[in-house]
Amino acid sequence: MKLTVWTYEGPPHVGAMRVATGMTGLHYVLHAPQGDTYADLLFTMIERRDHRPPVSYTTFQARDLGSDTAHLFKDSCRDAYERFKPEAIIVGASCTAELIQDDPGGLAETMGLPIPVIALELPSYQRKENFGCDETFFQIVRALAKPVEKTARVSCNILGPTGLGFRHRDDVEELTGLLSEMGVDVNVVAPMRSSPSDIARLGAAHFNVMLYPETCEAACRHLERAFQQPYTKTVPIGVGATRDFIAEVQGLTGVTGAPDENRLRLPWWSASVDSTYLTGKRVFLFGDATHVKASARIARDEMGFEVVGLGCYNREFARDIRKLAKEFGLEALITDDYLEVEKAIEEAAPEMILGTQMERHIGKRLGIPCAVISAPVHVQDFPARYSPQVGFEGANVIFDTWIHPLVMGLEEHLLAMFREDFEFHDAAGPSHHGGHAPKPMHDAPAASAAAGAEASMAEETAAPSQDAPAATGGDVTVWLADAEKELKKIPFFVRGKAKRNTEKYALEQGVTEISVDTLYEAKAHYAR
């Protein structure tokens, strides 16, 4: 464990909360101290749920540790059953409570409650939130699913959506409609929108849709072994992936129906005149493995972007992401440290970031546009509107989401054309903010024509750019006016990197004044 201001995943008991919160008729009794009782905040504030999560806590305090805390857990279990009358209870310990080793599962089994009690073994110090989702759902399915007769019509279970998931609510709706157009009924959606009695009839479906491997792959594998239910391997995010998914379902079931593509707009929108400016845009992707894999395909094959970096934070899928990165000629970034991600983004100098809420903050710091493609996300990414990621409508939503942060072709050409204008030059704030806009911080202001090279040098010496490396000893590197002017001709998205490389080269060569020649020598040096 480590102290950090940001984490991509919480401890595994948060994953168990997500499963329990998505379901009805299930209650989660969590052996936890006062400080671990934050489920209400997570689900009612961030996800805007209109009801509290079904979680009860033992809420032991420091003074309780000198005595037996097992009775606190038993009392909490009994109170939860009598108050909420659930169909089943899951029990476990938080990361802190795990240290006192009270064995909540064993304690609950001795109580003789008249409902199924499912014990969770979630190693808080080895695994994280997505594992908690996957393992919790697997244990629920293993305990409750029973052999039942198959449905008369071809049907499936949609598995994986949970509470606090990125667009899970709308993805379920979109996918249900897509399957309906194919002639496939949905038997159960789980864990979200299901109850323990629904879990019991999972076996009635002919196959399972593995919508989010992070949260349901173990359950899908179990159902395949126990009930001979095959499951889909393609996640239908993006046009190509959705078509592959349709073909996979047709192959599994023999159905010939296909959904209507008339409402699909991404292919034409991305081929339209203004969108040709998207071609070659350099993007960096980071998030959970499922959304990164899907987004990488969309970025390259459907939007015409150039992927310059990709990675994921969930190490369980590191092998898949490394394999994908090789196909793109890249080295995958597998880390849960946001500082490593920020460093990689800064070095890659992309024109756009596709990531999580943390990458949105990184983008703001670095001045790079960002679109959110993956959990963890904040409250603004649980929209009131219908906004799926899967299926054909999901592809339309993705197109809109990704291009909105970008400066489109004509707009950027106009900005370049009027770069020297008194109102639009680099030292002026955005015109729509009037005179109150702050001056940009990423580049030093250009010296005026009258001041000439000497004023520019003095200004740079007195207030060096934040991009410049710290001078050592008496070495001070300054930009001559003509070099500074030439630097501004470099596209803004790589200008910072070019400036840093030039200054580094100048320091290595002992050059104290950067001229146009120095700029191009540095370019040639780093191009080797």
Curated annotation (Swiss-Prot):
Keywords: 4Fe-4S, ATP-binding, Bacteriochlorophyll biosynthesis, Chlorophyll biosynthesis, Iron, Iron-sulfur, Metal-binding, Nucleotide-binding, Oxidoreductase, Photosynthesis. One of its GO terms (molecular function) is ATP binding. Residues 444-465 have a biased composition (Low complexity). The keyword Transmembrane does not apply. Pathway: Porphyrin-containing compound metabolism; bacteriochlorophyll biosynthesis (light-independent). It catalyses: chlorophyllide a + oxidized 2[4Fe-4S]-[ferredoxin] + 2 ADP + 2 phosphate = protochlorophyllide a + reduced 2[4Fe-4S]-[ferredoxin] + 2 ATP + 2 H2O. Its EC number is 1.3.7.7. Residues 429-471 are annotated as: Disordered. [4Fe-4S] cluster binds at residue 36. One of its GO terms (biological process) is photosynthesis, dark reaction. It is an enzyme of class 1 (oxidoreductase). It comes from the Bacteria. InterPro entries: ChlB/BchB/BchZ, LI-POR_suB-like_C, Nase/OxRdtase_comp1, P-CP_red_C, Protochl_reductB, Protochlorophyllide_Rdtase. Substrate binds at residues 409-410. The active site is at residue 274. HAMAP family: ChlB_BchB. Belongs to the ChlB/BchB/BchZ family. Component of the dark-operative protochlorophyllide reductase (DPOR) that uses Mg-ATP and reduced ferredoxin to reduce ring D of protochlorophyllide (Pchlide) to form chlorophyllide a (Chlide). This reaction is light-independent. The NB-protein (BchN-BchB) is the catalytic component of the complex. Protochlorophyllide reductase is composed of three subunits; BchL, BchN and BchB. Forms a heterotetramer of two BchB and two BchN subunits. This is Light-independent protochlorophyllide reductase subunit B. It comes from Dinoroseobacter shibae (strain DSM 16493 / NCIMB 14021 / DFL 12). The gene is bchB.
